[in-house]
Amino acid sequence: MSKQVQDAYIVAATRTPIGRSHRGYFRNTRPDDLLVKALQAVLAQVPSLDPKAIEDIICGCAIPEGPQGLNVARIGAVLAGLPTSVGGITVNRFCASGLSAIQMAADRIRVGEAEVMIAAGTESMSMVPMSGNSPSLSPNMFLNDENVGIAYGMGLTAEKVAQQWKVSREAQDQFALESHLKAIKAQQAGEFSMEITPVEVTDRTANLETGEVIAKTRTVSLDEGPRPDTSLEGLAKLKTVFAARGSVTAGNSSQTSDGAGALVLASEKAVKQFGLKPLARFVSYAAKGVPPEIMGIGPIEAIPAALRYAGLKQEDMDWIELNEAFAAQSLAVINTLKLDPAKVNRMGGAIALGHPLGATGAIRAATVIHALHRHQLKYGMVTMCVGMGQGAAGIFERV
């Protein structure tokens, strides 16, 4: 007997600040601990919810090994003090892992298999490098010349996009500058305060002469990446790092980062049962494949599909969070789809704010949901390119 599809509502959404990898806030903080911070904070937003009603936790993680291996979703659930009856599964669609976690959680509710779910994402690029610790790509991949692009470094794919879509170095640097300017302006205006959960971190320094270790604890509540001193002149001085005569630099690429985000999703039945207040309805999701060597164009395919599934038009979108993996691919997407620049990344993007890979989808979803409420807008979208040639997009409606 078929079940009627029901709506899935986001009733709570939060994230940690985003720290710079290796030398930043969370360089010594494990990714499972970051996840715990996000889980505990998001559940604190819905105190009337019985944790035993949570069916499962789905957590995105792009490189699920080392400190974020061994099913970090289940580990996070246990460390966060959730009932042992709450399951946990870690999912990996690289940069779209967190967004895919939201889609999977929503679908469980929409088909009637769950009343309450948690979707999350966590990533520590300080502790687990983007390439992983011991990657091993099948040698069979190189038997066909058409498959070679699957092994390209992300920066090289951005160079290819810049060449094919004719995105100049000057345009990329200008886009990067605007990302920082928008992020700084949003921070100064307190625009991120609703979505960010402050996190305590402990810094330890050692006296080399005495061996004494001094620990200092502080609370961080802002993303660490935005740089007030960013300028076109400074960006123009940076050398290209992926191609000798290229245009992609560290300055017009996303930052490697650490962070986590989490959302609570509930059915209409659970909303009424526990007295929850919906923030948004999950509307649609699409993931599409593209040639791996130009993976940055993924949103060009995913965005129209997500809109089609939702029965909406591009102009219906009021707020678009387009992950800035690289300025080159961001501009290629914006120009090809003719996205309204005024609606895209109004508070900056990954070039300024950072990109903790598998956590980014959950983090950007928290951003768009709270932004829709702050500005009384209706529809928002989160979209990103995905390594090895994919794109993903998800649409949310303010309730």
Q: Residue ranges of each PLM-predicted region?
A:
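Conserved catalytic cysteine-centered active-site region
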Residues: 29, 61-115, 149-156, 228-255, ...
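Condensing-enzyme catalytic core mediating Claisen C-C bond formation in acyl metabolism
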Residues: 2-31, 230-297, 301, 308, ...
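N-terminal extracellular/periplasmic Venus flytrap/periplasmic-binding protein-like
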Residues: 15-17, 28, 32, 37, ...
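Active-site pocket-lining segment
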Residues: 59, 156, 192-195, 283-352
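Active-site-proximal alpha-helical scaffold in enzymes
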Residues: 91-123, 162-192, 262-269, 334, ...
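Conserved active-site "lid/cap" helical segment
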Residues: 2-76, 80, 160-169, 179, ...
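Flexible glycine-/small-residue-enriched beta->alpha junction loops
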Residues: 111-164
